[in-house]
Amino acid sequence: MTGLDVSQPRISDYHFRHKHVARQAGDASKRNGRRHMAQFGNEEIGRAPHGPRDASGKRSLSERFTEWSLNWVPDSMVFVVALTVVVFLLALALTPHGPMELLDDYAKGFWVLLTFAMQLTVMMITGFVVADSKPVKSTLIRIVGIPRTARSTLIMFCLIVGIVAWLHWAAGLMVAIIMGKEIAVRKRGIGLHYPVLVASAYAMMMLMANGPSQSAPLLAATAGNFLEKSIGGLIPLTQTALSPFLLVFVLFELLTIPFIFVWLTPGKESAVDITDEIHDEFTQAPPAENTRRSDLRPAERWEHSWLPLSIVGVGILFWIANFVATRGIGKIDLNVINFALFGIGMVLHGSARSFVASVKQGVGTTSGVIIQFPLYAGIFGLIVHSGLSEVITHWFLSISTPRTYAWIVVIYTTIMDFFVPSGGSKFAIEAPYIIAAGQKLGIPVAHVINAYSTGGQLANLIQPFWALPFITAFRVRFQDILPYTFVIFIYAIVLASIAFLVLPAGL
């Protein structure tokens, strides 16, 4: 997951500017035993009556943890700037390069990721466009009506969000929000606990970190990447995201986590539904656009016509089908994925008007990639050209063995991604020493990449930064879902430890 729109409001704007309002609302909720709404800034955020406070009225561990995180973990842009300073000082202290030489190193690396950043930007936008199409939305809405019970609804929701997020994180985000809102509206009164529903949407997004749309495996599989020479060539997706080892790991998570959420759901008498206010907001129809052909100018008729985009889109999909048939899945790289998403998006939207409108909306998710990737590339230049990568590689070797190294990478990445929520962007600066240490220990590069990706998914479960789209869309607070996602975090840590300490890398 890369590049959340840095212009989005932080959850702290909703909560900590008016904490006293939330506390008063919480006390009122306890008195009347009903779900309530608390006003935070300009947004209404729903809360569960048995939310983060305990019976004595004290702030719970989840609320204190959330407050600490939101008070002290800044925006990712601040992190990358701070990392630049820290790495510069480390290189100055630990390598023979002086200040001007280090600035030269920084400049050498600054534009190394330019091509990759553009590729990721296109992938994020096109994935959003596919999920934002009318056929996908209408299909998801129809699927919501199939299950009848809270249990079956929650399991179905988790499975669909997990699968789509694994395929493409931006599409998974859209699917989670579209389906989640529809479920909240249509399944009121069946015992489906709203905080658990939102928590399950966010938690199942964790599977994206081990999917084929993630930065690390895509970078290693794409020709001309900056690591190609150091790792001895390209590493196909069949050795990383599509490897038997990682597929078994992801499949086990996919099939077990939904049942944990079922177990975490309270009884029907204690389950919390959305309020009437949120119900009205979720069901408000957008203004209808006048598309009567007789009222359109000739240019507008072409914009609304299905013919131009459909011809190009179908042609692209024929090429993709031929590519897979003749070259195989192992040859798929970032460019092929983007090409396929372009074609699918064109076919699903039909008209240029709909396609372009969706693209404009999806562009907002890419600002982090556009602005931050050059900064990460500059840090990469500092680490590689100054010799700092050799120093850090030695540190890793001093605490690792061939059996424990992959697990150490998992834990290291989990910790780093909690404090530096870059969504995989920082792989560019960590790859030189993480991969080099693994190579010296005889660990396959693909297995190191798999461990790195797995650590990223774990951190997201307890990091509120990436929860912002869910918090704003579903009108909840992070501490309302943290108790549930924290349980999944502990479970996933145990699974990852077993996988990378016990199971063979070549599974």
Label for each model-derived stretch:
Residues 1-4, 8, 113-225, 419:
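Early transmembrane hairpin of solute transport permeases
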Residues 37-125, 242-255, 259-372, 487-491, ...:
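Hydrophobic transmembrane alpha-helices of multi-pass small-molecule transporters
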Residues 7-21, 150-165, 189-215, 234-238, ...:
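Alpha-helical transmembrane segments of multi-pass membrane proteins
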Residues 15-17, 179-273, 467-499:
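Membrane-core helix-loop-helix motifs of multi-pass transport proteins
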Residues 1-3, 12-17, 31-41, 138-141, ...:
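Re-entrant/interfacial helical elements at transmembrane boundaries that shape
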Residues 1, 146-179, 370-386, 397-436, ...:
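Hydrophobic alpha-helical transmembrane segments of multi-pass integral membrane proteins
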Residues 4-12, 75, 110-117, 144-156, ...:
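Membrane-interfacial loop-to-helix junctions in multi-pass transporters
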